[in-house]
Design a protein with these regions (language model features):
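Short glycine/proline/serine/threonine-rich loop/turn segments at secondary-structure transition edges
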Residues: 155-159, 267-278
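Bacterial Sec-dependent N-terminal signal peptides
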Residues: 1-23
């Protein structure tokens, strides 16, 4: 009996040691203090923050208002809209108080003698991170995820470490509402010294068929000496959680090169929007026979092809993108990430028949990408609205030359294992596209994509068609993406070598839910005394169009590979056509769905064409029109049916 007790004690101790060896990842959500304003001494451990506001992260400090016309007034000429003279833009960034400096403070405990990393999914913006009074890292771009090893700054016993984050948003730094603060999650990651770093795995599928898939896993190992023997045991789990294959490999880290394992998955379940099957690779890392890390990588098995003149193929089947562009805010909820709200948005889009999302014009929250993996949406992930030439006085151009490569690498490493991502975009309507050296900048960014992820093509949203056809810019991009300019698709196809055209941004029809204007006719930049737009879906801006043109292009040509409509949802800021001295307008009217997540009439137009599994019959406008007695009120039907009869 005594021997059994000793054995049991040894087993318990062994289990405890193994548990301690596992990584831990914690969301730092609660027990934060926040204050608007600049307090340089707030980085120090002994700073008194008791009078600060208690907040929960994610947190958008600006969404609480108040709305005010004077918040971030911008006197600019929007060259993308062909404006030549500057004018006062009211509500361009939503009329919310995002400008200024704010501080966040909290504390955390970790075990002693561990490696500790802080991962920020996004911090708006110019984030300076302090641990125990010392600056641990700086990251200027508020949309990107970044991480920093804070081990050197920790208290020796790992207890009561002070974390302070300073954020600053400058005026005229955005064309829409960016949000403010720690609006995405903050992760505390604790590992052994030898471990897999953040985004430390890369999974590719060199061969995919119905019979089998070849899966390649490359794993980075940090802090392993050249003499350390590394053993990695990896199991591949199927979508239903069963182990379908496993490998054990030994070796030594060779000059920082990743550890490679290759697998065969028989009869794979292929990822697609209709069947978003997800696998998982679970890797255990041993250093000199001691378990030091366990790391899980979710991935999908699917094959993408872009074939000249033929179009886009997913798993061998031809299809066209039925996509929308979305900004990152959640309307009245602000920019703070909210998984339930994102899921609700995607559910509405799924029912409409949408199968793709463009993250305009910035890196998305990881939660959105994970939901697209799970719910079956293809993604075009896009990082930048400007490069080295400014759109906004205090925009990203200030950091581009120094930070662009680092921002690109973080984005690519963060999302290259997600099967939903089927292409990268390197920018949106950047003024650099017309620069004499614009193609060199584009090539610089595209080459980074090819280097870090050779499995996906690159596009760019181009609106200056004459420039990019003449200067080599469009010819160099893997997949030419045209924003609007539907009348020039054929010309671009004829002149460019790729023999494919993507509608990277289309339509921009404007409408207000439940508002109908008479007489009913096509209009550009129409404005009314009530600051609304007609929901007859016949109004657009001077530079945009109604949906019909884009549908016709999709029907007529195999070489058009689909579209991303501007936008799926209304968003805060950019209230075209009421963007010039037109307060109180402070949100867009482009959305197929409004700020409250209520579908507009246009939703049913897209649903009738895109959702081929559902019946759609939607009639507009409504029935009662006091004051229009004796006048003709046009009735419009959106339906998938070849014919139907309306009886009044």
């Amino acid at each position: 009996m005594k021997h059994q007790k000793q054995l049991f004690t040894v087993l318990l101790m062994s289990a405890a040691c193994m548990l301690q060896a596992q990584r831990s990842e914690t969301l730092l959500e609660k027990n934060w203090k926040f204050s608007k304003g600049d307090f340089p001494e707030a980085a120090q451990t002994d700073y008194n923050d008791t009078k600060w506001e208690s907040v929960v992260i994610p947190h958008d400090w600006a969404i609480f208002g108040p709305f005010d016309m004077n918040n971030d007034l911008q006197n600019v000429a929007v060259t993308q809209n062909f404006e030549k003279k500057a004018s006062l833009k009211t509500g361009r960034t939503g009329g919310l108080p995002y400008v200024g400096t704010g501080w966040y403070r909290t504390s955390f405990d970790v075990p002693a003698d561990k490696e500790v990393t802080l991962l920020f999914d996004g911090a708006m913006s110019e984030a300076r991170v302090y641990v125990n009074g010392q600056e641990a890292c700086f990251w200027p771009f508020g949309y990107n995820s970044f991480h920093c090893n804070v081990t050197p700054f920790l208290n020796k016993d790992g207890k009561n470490n002070t974390l302070a984050v300073r954020l600053e948003n400058r005026p005229q730094s955005s064309r829409w509402y960016p949000g403010a603060g720690l609006y995405r999650n903050v992760h505390l990651i604790v590992t052994e010294k030898v471990h897999i770093p953040v985004w430390g795995t890369q999974i590719t599928t060199p061969h995919v068929s119905d019979e089998f898939a070849a899966v390649r896993l490359q794993t980075k190992i940090e802090n392993a000496g050249e003499k350390t023997e590394i053993r990695i045991e990896t199991e591949i789990l199927s979508p239903d959680g069963k182990v379908v294959t496993r490998k054990e490999n030994k070796g030594r880290i060779n000059h920082g090169q990743p550890f490679e394992q290759n697998f065969i998955v028989n009869a794979p379940q292929l990822w697609s929007p209709e069947s978003p099957a997800l696998y998982k690779a679970v890797s255990k890392v041993y250093a000199d026979n001691q378990l030091v890390d366990t790391y899980s990588t979710r991935f999908g098995i699917r094959n993408i092809e872009y074939i000249a003149d033929k179009g886009f193929y997913l798993n061998g089947k031809h299809r066209k993108f039925q996509g929308v562009c979305n900004h990152h805010d959640l309307g009245p909820l602000g920019a703070a990430i909210n998984v339930a709200a994102l899921r609700h948005q995607l559910t509405l889009l799924k029912d409409m028949g949408c199968d793709a999302i463009r993250t305009s014009h910035n890196m998305p929250a990881p939660e959105l990408v994970e939901l697209c993996d799970e719910m079956g949406f293809m993604m075009m992930i896009e990082p930048f609205d400007e490069w080295d030439i400014a759109k906004c006085e205090n925009g990203y151009h200030r950091y581009f030359n120094e930070w662009a490569e680092r921002d690109m690498v973080n984005m690519l490493h963060n999302y290259r294992n997600n099967p939903c991502v089927v292409m990268w975009s390197i920018g949106n309507e950047v003024p650099t596209q017309c620069s004499p050296v614009g193609y060199k900048v584009a090539k610089f960014l595209q080459d980074i994509c090819h280097r870090e992820d050779p499995t996906r093509p690159v596009t760019c949203g181009m609106d200056q068609v004459t420039c990019v056809l003449a200067n080599g810019f469009a010819a160099m991009i893997d997949i030419p993406g045209l924003n609007y300019r539907a009348n020039r698709y054929q010309e671009a196809y004829d002149k460019l070598p790729q023999n494919l055209i993507l509608g990277s941004e289309t339509a921009s029809t404007v409408s207000s839910r439940g508002v109908y204007k008479f007489p009913v006719k096509d209009k550009k930049s129409a404005q009314y005394d009530d600051h609304q737009c007609s929901s007859y879906d016949v109004e657009a801006c001077s530079w945009s169009n109604i949906p019909d043109e884009d549908f016709a292009l999709a029907d007529d040509h195999h070489w058009t590979i689909g579209q991303f409509v501007w936008t799926g949802f209304d968003y805060l800021g950019e209230p075209s056509p009421y963007d010039t001295d037109a307060w109180p307008n402070h949100s867009s009217m482009f959305g197929i769905i409004d700020l409250a997540s209520l579908p507009k009439d246009r939703y049913y137009l897209y649903r009738s064409i895109w959702n081929k599994e559902a019946e759609t019959l939607h009639i507009l406008p409504h029935w009662t029109w006091p004051g229009r007695e004796g006048e003709v009120t046009p009735a419009v039907s959106y339906t998938h049916l070849r014919a139907h009869e309306t009886v009044l």
